[in-house]
UniProtKB/Swiss-Prot annotation:
Homology family: Belongs to the herpesviridae TRX2 protein family.
Source organism (scientific name): Human herpesvirus 6B (strain Z29) (HHV-6 variant B)
Gene behind this protein: TRX2
InterPro entries tied to this protein: Herpes_capsid_2
Role played: Structural component of the T=16 icosahedral capsid. The capsid is composed of pentamers and hexamers of major capsid protein/MCP, which are linked together by heterotrimers called triplexes. These triplexes are formed by a single molecule of triplex protein 1/TRX1 and two copies of triplex protein 2/TRX2. Additionally, TRX1 is required for efficient transport of TRX2 to the nucleus, which is the site of capsid assembly.
Principal location class: virion
Domain of life: Viruses
Subunit text: Interacts with TRX1 and major capisd protein/MCP.
Subcellular localization: Virion; Host nucleus
The protein's name: Triplex capsid protein 2
GO cellular component terms, semicolon-separated: host cell nucleus; viral capsid
The entry's keywords: Capsid protein, Host nucleus, Virion
Molecular function, one GO term: structural molecule activity
Tagged with keyword Ubl conjugation: no
A Pfam family annotated for this UniProt entry: Herpes_V23
Length: 296
């Protein structure tokens, strides 16, 4: 486990040290692997101070190095870079309760969360990501992508009601409101990737899926397969040759289509899913701390 030392430009007061001591085991990202850093490279403040777009901050956060605050020594913090497979005590910085077995990821702060900024020193503030279950992180990404796509071709007054509904998420009895969408280059890239991927899936998937569904229904007469077959039969028309024996060239072409479709599905998953950093082994009684295995 690597140690990272963070030195502050400002003298830490007793109150500052007391505040930091209450933040032991908090996850703090840093831009890159360095043994010694300044407070300017600690946490998300360098990003959130200049950019308020959730998608942009999320994309930068995905590239950052995870560390865990271990202790305060004088005017510096001692951070540990976790090792895969090892157990660590992790502080819950998110609004949602954790449960044993949860997979956890990191997301940018939400504007409705009251503990986004934990310590202020001069012009600098300690801003950390929220550690949340991957399921809610994916739901947030999906909703933001949906809002962005709707906003591209709808008038504001036409979509306001549905956007208000999409922006409110209740998860484990906790209600949050999503940040505002900024359709900048980062968001537009996500929407473009989603549209290109969906276009290719729409163009290539129906024929090959229909072929496999037809074959599978001969072996398995489940109602779900039959319903899928009926749905596809309304959308696609297959030549009788497709049901016969495939030539080598046809098989190669078919394989390319399958790989392309799966690649496009993976592209969409990359827009909505977040990687797992921790798996919860045990949770404290107040749900503010958990023993977790580092998985990244």
């Amino acid at each position: 486990m690597e140690t990272v030392y963070c030195t502050f430009d400002h003298k830490l007061s007793l109150s500052d040290i007391s505040t930091l001591c209450k933040l032991m085991n908090i996850v703090i990202p840093i831009p890159a692997h360095h043994h010694l850093i300044g407070s300017g490279n600690l946490g998300l403040y360098p990003i959130v101070s200049s950019n308020k777009d959730y998608v942009h901050i999320r994309n930068v956060l995905r590239t950052m190095v995870v560390t865990i605050l271990q202790k305060v020594e004088g005017n510096q913090l001692v951070l540990r870079k976790p090792m895969t497979g090892q157990q660590y005590a992790i502080k819950n910085t998110g609004p949602f309760p954790w449960e044993k077995g949860d997979t956890l990821t990191l997301i940018p702060p939400l504007s409705t969360h009251s503990e986004e900024k934990l310590l202020k020193l001069g012009d600098w503030e300690l801003t950390v990501p929220l550690v949340v279950p991957t399921a809610i992180a994916a739901e947030i990404n999906i909703r933001l992508l949906c809002i962005g796509l709707i906003a591209v071709h709808r008038e504001y007054n036409e979509m306001q009601t549905i956007i208000d509904e999409l922006c409110s998420i209740q998860y484990r009895d906790v209600l949050i409101k999503l940040p505002d969408i900024v359709n900048d280059k980062q968001s537009m890239y996500s929407m473009k990737t989603a549209c290109i991927s969906l276009s290719m899936i729409t163009a290539m998937a129906p024929d090959i899926v229909r072929t496999y569904i037809d074959r599978l229904t001969l072996e398995d007469h489940s109602m779900l397969l039959i319903k899928c077959q009926e749905l596809l039969s309304k959308r696609t028309t297959l030549s009788t040759q497709r049901c016969g024996q495939l030539h080598a060239t046809d098989i190669k072409d078919e394989l390319k289509k399958i790989k392309s479709v799966l690649t496009m599905i993976d592209q969409i998953n990359s827009l909505t899913n977040e990687k797992t950093y921790f798996v919860v082994c045990d949770v404290s009684a107040d749900n503010r701390m958990a023993t977790c295995i580092y998985k990244n």
